[in-house]
């Protein structure tokens, strides 16, 4: 799967751009503020319905316009597919796939699986467990068709349970919701655990190339003590849940733990090593997607030269090329990427003041 055509209209400082990317490495270069990262952001927005840089979607709309429009043609095994997204300053969103209106943004994500390696994506290890849960759930969503419905049911029941706790409801009234909560939690936890086990098999080899002297152990924690029955835990923790007004333990507290010896990876590794570990996680996730459902991710790699030294840039780009996936990578100077590749980029684009030019 790859993007073979991309139209961007009124997205940040890009008023209008048309790109015909290659299936391989696409190098986008230009000075800071030129709009090169906005191209990556537009691709991400088209696949996720939101930005990886700002949670306020209205900010990505060009200041002089009341809406943005993104359109792409995808090359898929079954043939070409067209996807389009329009976001209004009012917050309304219109999505179409092959001319048909789509109501759920999750359909976009399913159609266009995207992996991001940016300065912001390194928060996967530096921040709390939420980003690591999202990492697990990205993979579970794309590789198991039952995950999305189960997780949406967990969220629905958890919201109802927390509301009852805030209302001071007695436990006999909450028990009905607990039965639902337990059922869907078992489904979500099983899928997550199975996914992390599969990821681990691929991850060991990739980490070995990035960090050959480091033994990183990766494990899944489900959000409560693995030795404790979840039904018994919910009942015994009811007084605490009631006091706090929310459910303290459960699948919404799950985490992906990475350790070196007895220490969390965040404490044992340097910042540079942690960046390489995040790159390994992203590459393993893309490879697993291809292995399990025969579908490539699209990789968006922003500002690589500022994040990794020349040796590790070369290693990362080699790994990305080996995935066979389509890659979009940005840099201020093209030489920083070109010199790190064994063969020239498949296509190069220069961006200046929001204008995109293909370099022949």
From Swiss-Prot:
GO cellular component: cytoplasm
Principal location listed in the UniProt entry: cytoplasm
Keyword terms: ATP-binding, Cytoplasm, DNA damage, DNA repair, DNA replication, DNA-binding, Nucleotide-binding, SOS response
PANTHER family, A to Z: DNA REPLICATION AND REPAIR PROTEIN RECF
GO biological process: DNA replication; DNA synthesis involved in DNA repair; double-strand break repair; SOS response
Chain's role: The RecF protein is involved in DNA metabolism; it is required for DNA replication and normal SOS inducibility. RecF binds preferentially to single-stranded, linear DNA. It also seems to bind ATP.
Cellular compartments annotated: Cytoplasm
Cell membrane as UniProt keyword: no
Pfam family for this entry, one: SMC_N
UniProt similarity note: Belongs to the RecF family.
Residues reported to bind ATP: 30-37
Entries under InterPro entries matching the protein: DNA-binding_RecF, DNA-binding_RecF_CS, P-loop_NTPase, RecF/RecN/SMC_N, RecF_2
Molecular function terms from GO: ATP binding; single-stranded DNA binding
Keyword Magnesium in record: no
Protein name: DNA replication and repair protein RecF
Superkingdom of origin: Bacteria
């Amino acid at each position: 799967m790859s993007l073979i055509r991309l139209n961007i209209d009124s997205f940040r400082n890009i008023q209008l751009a048309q790109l015909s990317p290659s299936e391989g490495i696409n190098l986008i270069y230009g000075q800071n503020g030129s709009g090169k990262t906005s191209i990556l952001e537009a691709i991400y927005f088209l696949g996720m319905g939101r930005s990886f840089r700002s949670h306020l979607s209205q900010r990505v709309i060009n200041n002089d316009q009341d809406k943005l429009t993104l359109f792409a043609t995808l090359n898929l095994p079954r043939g070409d597919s067209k996807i389009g997204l329009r976001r209004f300053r009012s917050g309304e969103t219109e999505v179409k796939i092959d001319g048909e209106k789509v109501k759920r943004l999750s359909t976009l994500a399913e159609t266009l699986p995207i992996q991001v390696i940016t300065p912001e994506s390194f928060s996967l290890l530096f921040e709390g467990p939420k980003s690591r849960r999202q990492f697990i759930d990205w993979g579970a969503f794309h590789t198991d068709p039952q995950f999305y419905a189960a997780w949406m049911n967990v969220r629905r029941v958890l919201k109802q349970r927390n509301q009852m706790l805030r209302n001071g409801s007695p436990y006999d009234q909450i028990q009905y919701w607990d039965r639902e909560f337990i059922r869907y939690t078992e489904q979500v936890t099983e899928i997550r655990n199975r996914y992390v086990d599969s990821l681990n098999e691929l991850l060991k080899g990739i980490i070995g190339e990035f960090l050959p002297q480091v033994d990183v152990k990766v494990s899944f924690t489900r959000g409560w003590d693995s030795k404790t029955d979840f039904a018994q835990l919910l009942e015994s923790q009811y007084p605490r849940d009631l006091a706090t007004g929310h459910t303290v333990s459960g699948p919404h507290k799950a985490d992906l733990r990475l350790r070196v010896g007895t220490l969390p990876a965040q404490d044992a590794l340097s910042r540079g090593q942690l960046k390489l570990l995040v790159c390994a996680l992203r590459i393993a996730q893309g490879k697993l997607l291809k292995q399990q459902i025969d579908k490539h991710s699209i990789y968006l790699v922003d500002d690589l030269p500022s994040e990794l030294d020349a040796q590790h840039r070369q290693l990362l780009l080699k790994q990305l090329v080996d995935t066979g996936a389509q890659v979009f990578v940005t840099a201020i100077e093209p030489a920083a990427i070109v010199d790190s590749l064994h063969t020239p980029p498949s296509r190069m684009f220069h961006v200046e003041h929001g204008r995109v030019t293909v370099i022949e």
